């Protein structure tokens, strides 16, 4: 879990740095005549957004583009959520192993790693599954950033009060992006039977990273991130409802208690008849 936290933080920091670099880097316009592959990809995304705007607003195009991307990537995000849940379910056993092998010597650490790998393999845990959506979205976000900064018909677009090619100085979108990120993380962790410091740090740390990123990004990118995380909240609620998981877990526990009570009563009754 700690490794995942460190890697997620590193990816977030990398994205923030790349955003800053993009802001201060090359700002020449990208057009249909641009020759290099990256510029063609950026312009392709821009054309999709313009098509999806239906001549209403570029903001509408970005919203529909986000929904389209998230729907296409739905299987990948579902794999991430399942992987995260498996990782969380494995934590009590991992904690027990750490208590069983507390030594700092090479032999103890090696044995601990071996036993942890066995647990992960048994429970079908692959840490890389949790990171695929982040890795896949990074080029999409960077291409969208470049499109809003360097494609003329996007960088001059507006949606409500937002100039999509400039930062949202009202901070409404960065705040919304952070709030929806927190809600999606909170929902994902709601059904945890046990929480640790790393889980709590991710729940509060990732929204902060998203907020900082959205503050310095063009309004269109902040809009993308807001809609993307709102989509994630709905996906979690309808496909991985934590309240349903908790209710099912409590029902299993209650059924076990009822079974034990019936066995106890049957045993007492049998003893009385002797």
UniProtKB/Swiss-Prot annotation:
It comes from the Bacteria. It is a multi-pass membrane protein. A lipid is attached at residue 21 (N-palmitoyl cysteine). Belongs to the OXA1/ALB3/YidC family. Type 2 subfamily. The chain crosses the membrane at residues 56-76, 128-148, 167-187, 205-225. GO terms for cellular component: plasma membrane. One of its GO terms (molecular function) is membrane insertase activity. Residues 1-20 form the signal peptide. It is found in: Cell membrane. It comes from Streptococcus pneumoniae serotype 4 (strain ATCC BAA-334 / TIGR4). InterPro entries: YidC/ALB3/OXA1/COX18, YidC/Oxa/ALB_C, YidC/YidC1/YidC2_Firmicutes, YidC_ALB_C. Keywords: Cell membrane, Chaperone, Lipoprotein, Membrane, Palmitate, Protein transport, Signal, Transmembrane, Transmembrane helix, Transport. NCBIfam families: yidC_oxa1_cterm. Coiled coil: none annotated. This is Membrane protein insertase YidC 2. Required for the insertion and/or proper folding and/or complex formation of integral membrane proteins into the membrane. Involved in integration of membrane proteins that insert both dependently and independently of the Sec translocase complex, as well as at least some lipoproteins. A lipid is attached at residue 21 (S-diacylglycerol cysteine). Its main location: membrane. One of its GO terms (biological process) is protein transport. The gene is yidC2.
